[in-house]
Regions:
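Outer-membrane beta-barrel "beta-signal"
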Residues: 125-139
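Short beta-strand segments enriched in hydrophobic/aromatic residues
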Residues: 2-4, 44, 59, 95, ...
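Strand-connecting loop/turn motifs
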Residues: 46-52, 93-99, 128
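Short proline/glycine-enriched turn/loop segments at secondary-structure junctions
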Residues: 46, 120-124
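Residues on the lipid-exposed face of transmembrane beta-strands in outer-membrane beta-barrel proteins
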Residues: 36-42, 89-93, 102-104, 133-137
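Detector for outer-membrane/organellar transmembrane beta-barrel domains
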Residues: 1-81, 85
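C-terminal beta-signal and adjacent terminal beta-strands/loops
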Residues: 97, 104-117
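Surface-exposed coil/turn segments at beta-strand junctions on protein surfaces, enriched
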Residues: 80, 93, 124-126
Length: 139
């Protein structure tokens, strides 16, 4: 997905002031971003119940503004985020009304120094790992 000012889509995006006129009015420019995700799911029948294997991958990148930002900027996420990706494999075992699952999640965000168009360079990665478990009984 390519979008402008797509913070409502949970993308690294927003808008900023690109011109300030003598009468106090302001012109705004949108931040551009690109992102997407991919999810594969496979269900495997067992003698008792079944396994569901899932693999999720997502990516989003800040492409900056088409014009220089000369005033305040309003955006989703930190103003120095360049890109973010997430990988989350999971497995779910279901037997009759009971399900138990586990998901491993690795999320990496590249932070750096924004230029006047809020394109970010000189990045360094920060990674977070999570393990999530689930137990469910349907009745």
């Amino acid at each position: 997905t390519y979008a402008q000012n797509a913070s409502h889509l949970s993308m690294i995006s927003g808008y900023g002031v690109t011109e300030i006129y003598d009468n106090g009015e302001q012109k705004y420019g949108a931040l551009n971003s690109i992102g997407g995700w991919f999810d594969i799911t496979k269900k495997e029948q067992l003698k008792k119940g079944y396994l569901t294997w899932c693999w999720f991958w997502g990516y989003t990148k800040n492409l900056g503004c088409n014009d220089d930002i000369v005033g305040p900027i309003y955006m989703r996420g930190e103003k120095n985020m360049d890109r973010m990706w997430r990988v989350a494999p999971s497995v779910l075992y279901t037997h009759n009304a009971m399900s138990i699952g586990i998901e491993l999640d690795a999320t990496t965000v590249a932070y750096g120094t924004p230029d006047s168009r809020y394109k970010v360079s000189d990045t360094h990665n920060v990674t977070n790992f999570r393990i999530c478990t689930m137990l469910k009984y349907n009745f």
